[in-house]
Each structure stands twice: as C-alpha cells, then as structure tokens.
C-alpha cells in the first residue's frame, strides 16, 4: 500500500477567489506518493475535459505527479447562497496507480452579498396637522436567510421611524421639536434615517417635514388717548413672539383709521396722529369721546387691535 501525503485540502472564498474573466473559483495543491512497488508511485491523471473528476460543486484535475487543481463555478446558487461565516465542502477521491484512493477536500467559504433594497423610501408629514407617514421596503438577498429587516425603532433628528422585519415602516413626527415648530408655512425640513437589512446593507429613508403657520403672540401697549385741539398724538410699543423662524416682527406701515393715522415700525413701536380736521372729531363736545380701532398684523399675518380713545 502506498503512502500518500502532501497538500490534500484547499480553501476558496465565494466571489473573492473568482477569476474575473471566467468567474471560476480555483484551488491548487500537490500530493506526494511513496510506493515500494516498482512503477506504481504515481497517480491516475485526469484533465479538465471529459475525464475530469467531478465533485458536488466543482471538478478536479490531477496529474501523474500529484499536482491537482480544483475549479468551481462561482455563480452556482449553492455558492451564492452562502453568507459570511458559512461554508460548503467538496470531497473528491483521487486514485494512485495501484488503485489506492485518497480524498482531496476543498472548503468553499461564503461571503456577504449585499442586499438589494427597494420600495418606498420617502414620506411627508406636516407640522401640527399630519404627524405620521408610512411606507414599505422590499429586500432581496442571494445569501440564504438574509432577505429581511429587524423590528427596530430608529430615532431621527425630527422624529422616530418604526421598522418591521417585513420592511413596513411608520414615521412619527415629534411635533414638539423646536426645529419643527420653527418651520413657517411654505418652508420644509428633512429627516434622513438609515435602516439596515439583516446582512447590514444600509438604505436611507427621507422624510420631508412641511411647516405651517404658528400664530404669533402679540402683547404690549395696545391703547392710547388723544384730545381734540390740544393733544393730537399718542404712542406705544407692541411686543411679538413667534416660534416660526423670522416672523417675530411687524412691517413699517401707515394705517389709516377713521379719525387718524397709525404709524407702525417693524420693531412694534407705534404712533397715532389724530386728524383734528375730521368733522367727527370737531363734533365732539367736552366730556364726549369717540374711538378709533385699528388692526395691525405681525409678519405672519396675525391680527391685533390698537384702540385709540
């Protein structure tokens, strides 16, 4: 009986070890043989043709001197289905000149094939009124058991995305977020959240947050008094706060009332000039009063009344 030694194992890695032209995975080695019987210290040769030794996933060529080469088609479903850390083995028997057999064992190691993710990747919500949007992702992955997601909640900058293992997702807007409340009508913000399939392939879901008009809060001096003939002017200052960015102000404007004119500045200071020639003013007797109510508006259109006696 001959003694067979040498390299009788090989290792391949899905995709990584593949020839870029042929997409074949290959491994090589050399067996040694010692046989005391004259003329039998060699192997039965097989080439990569009809006489190649066929394994379960590939084929093996061996020469008389023990040099062998193993080749497998990298595109096979069984190989492409391997994930990182998974493996297949292909055991092929070679034969020496006297009929003694020996196993050559080739291990095919898997690698992570990136998933392909599609479906609904965008959504829209609106401050105050529409706080939720939803969609569904699709995922395909040639690696067995990896065509799915995990149930998870992912915090974005403006809300939270809830993802199920089947790919359906729901986004809840945090309506109390200062950035959200600062959005005015016609302005938008985006919240981009990255999700991952089971194998770690990333995919982005982008949510558009539409702003709405938050009414300003107006305070300060909203009344004044003038007197026919003697005191024809009065003034005051309004205050304004508005969570919508850039809207906490007024506009420089002159507003005609029924008995005079109000002059308003952008910072809220106002002056009222009585039209002393107005017949209604001149018709007032001592102890009699009239009122002139004038409506002003902040930058976002919030109305406020100033009443002059």
Where are these regions (language model features)?
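Acidic, turn/loop-rich segments in luminal/extracellular domains of secretory-pathway
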Residues: 52-109, 128, 154-210, 229, ...
């Amino acid at each position: 009986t001959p003694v067979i030694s040498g390299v009788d194992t090989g290792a391949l890695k899905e995709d990584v070890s593949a020839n870029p032209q042929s997409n074949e995975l290959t491994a090589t080695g050399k067996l040694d043989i010692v046989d005391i019987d004259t003329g039998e210290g060699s192997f039965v040769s097989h080439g990569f043709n009809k006489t190649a030794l066929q394994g379960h996933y590939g084929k093996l060529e061996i020469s008389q001197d023990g040099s062998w080469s193993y080749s497998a088609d990298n595109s096979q479903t069984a190989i492409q289905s391997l994930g990182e850390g998974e493996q297949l083995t292909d055991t092929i028997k070679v034969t020496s000149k006297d009929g003694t057999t020996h196993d050559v064992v080739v291990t095919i190691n898997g690698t992570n094939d990136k998933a392909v993710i599609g479906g609904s990747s965008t959504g829209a919500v609106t401050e105050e009124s529409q706080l939720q949007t939803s969609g569904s992702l699709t995922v395909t992955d040639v690696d067995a058991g990896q065509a799915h997601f995990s149930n998870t909640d992912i915090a974005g900058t403006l809300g939270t995305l809830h993802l199920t293992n089947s790919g359906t997702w729901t986004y809840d807007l945090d309506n109390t977020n200062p950035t959200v409340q600062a959005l005015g009508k016609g302005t938008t913000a985006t919240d981009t959240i990255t999700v991952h399939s089971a194998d770690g392939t990333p995919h982005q879901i982008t949510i558009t947050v539409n702003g709405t008009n938050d009414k300003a809060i107006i305070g300060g001096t909203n009344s004044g008094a003038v007197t026919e003939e003697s005191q024809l002017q009065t003034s005051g200052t309004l205050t304004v706060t508005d969570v919508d960015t850039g809207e906490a102000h007024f506009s420089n404007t002159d507003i005609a009332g029924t008995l005079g004119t109000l002059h308003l500045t952008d910072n809220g200071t106002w002056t009222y000039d009585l039209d002393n020639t107005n017949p209604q003013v001149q018709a007032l007797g001592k102890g009699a009063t009239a009122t002139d109510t004038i409506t002003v508006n902040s930058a976002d259109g919030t109305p406020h009344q100033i009443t002059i006696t």
